[in-house]
Amino acid sequence: MTSLEELSNIASQVRRDILRMVTKAKSGHPGGSLSSTDILTALFFRVMDHDPATWTRQTAGQDAFLLSAGHLAPVLYSVLAHAGYFPVSELATLRDFGSRLQGHPSTEHNLPGIILPSGSLGQGLSAAAGIALAKRLDGDPHRVFVLCGDGESEEGQIWEAAMFAAHQGLDKLVAMTDWNGQQIDGRVEDVAGLDALEEKWTAFGWNVVVADGHDFSSILQAFEIACAAANGKPTMILFQTEMGHGVDFMAGTHQWHGKAPSEEQCAAALAQLKETLGDY
């Protein structure tokens, strides 16, 4: 079992990967990738039942993960690489022409770990609900995990999927929201506020867990609660996070939602993060 210290070390390296990938590509979304790093690190290295050696897009016999907030591709690519889905060295190809690591997850080049393309915000939760229903019909007891953004939650399709999943009683569906309070145009509360988000999901018939998205003990406890749920309801984990977490000048501002750092800024950011697993 991966220890809390090991999770912290993996997360530090993932954050370094994110910064180096986006800087080289001169394009990408570092802010939300940094805020969701701890969540995906815990999920892939402690929670999910998955095996890169036998993984297929059908995910038969193992848990499934979808990234609904597809612009957070850098964090997913790094986590997948360190989990053994493809060589870590391939991270250097983010957004290159012909690369398997497109700016948003794509199935065009058959990158292991990617079930469906994503990036058109709001669609991933619907897809995850469909996969959860399919697993139930197939007699597969495994779970489906999906990560959404809080800005993404302004999309109407999120709430259509919420109704569908609750109506179908999909208690093997675990959704997560990276609740960092920022989106491309500013603070979420200023753009289209998500007041009473916990109450909204409860009203839609979901189990709701609120957790600190940067504390591994809190994250793991939230997943434990979600995975133990067997009451005929899907579960939403609202992870309270900070945009750009881990880098002081990126933290807590929407300015780094979709902006690549310069070489100098990247160096300053990397100086704040331990190289724990070795840079690619």
Q: Predicted regions span which residues?
A:
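Glycine/aspartate-rich loop-and-adjacent alpha/beta segment that forms the canonical ThDP
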Residues: 216, 221-280
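N-terminal capping segment at the start of a domain
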Residues: 10-27, 178-180
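Non-catalytic, mobile gating and regulatory segments of ester bond hydrolases
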Residues: 1-6
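Short acidic, glycine/serine/threonine-rich loops at helix termini
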Residues: 77-79, 106, 157-159, 185-189, ...
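Histidine-centered active-site/metal-ligand motif
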Residues: 29, 71, 104-107, 123, ...
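Thiamine diphosphate
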Residues: 111-113, 117-120, 125-229
